């Protein structure tokens, strides 16, 4: 039963998927890799807790690789993203480095296909 799963936090929430290209409103999505110094006795949890509480943050993941976290944020402009990284994220004491990646085009998100590839309608020219 859905109500029981909601009560037990098995279903954690619902969200709306918006195709911003169709709305005509610009939205910038950034995936920020963050390298940190884990805190003694707390590991990564306290840093993750601090980062996830920023309103701009949509997702925070602990990842394996050269960086420790992947932080996904959205803003209306590149300047908003830049301000978040330089004025909020990078100044956190245990943050060592960040690498910001901007989403150029979205093909699929949360299982939803956003843009179906169009068929190439050019004619083949053969000698």
Where are each of the predicted segments found?
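A compositional/biophysical signature of low hydrophobicity enriched in polar/charged and small residues
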Residues: 1-127
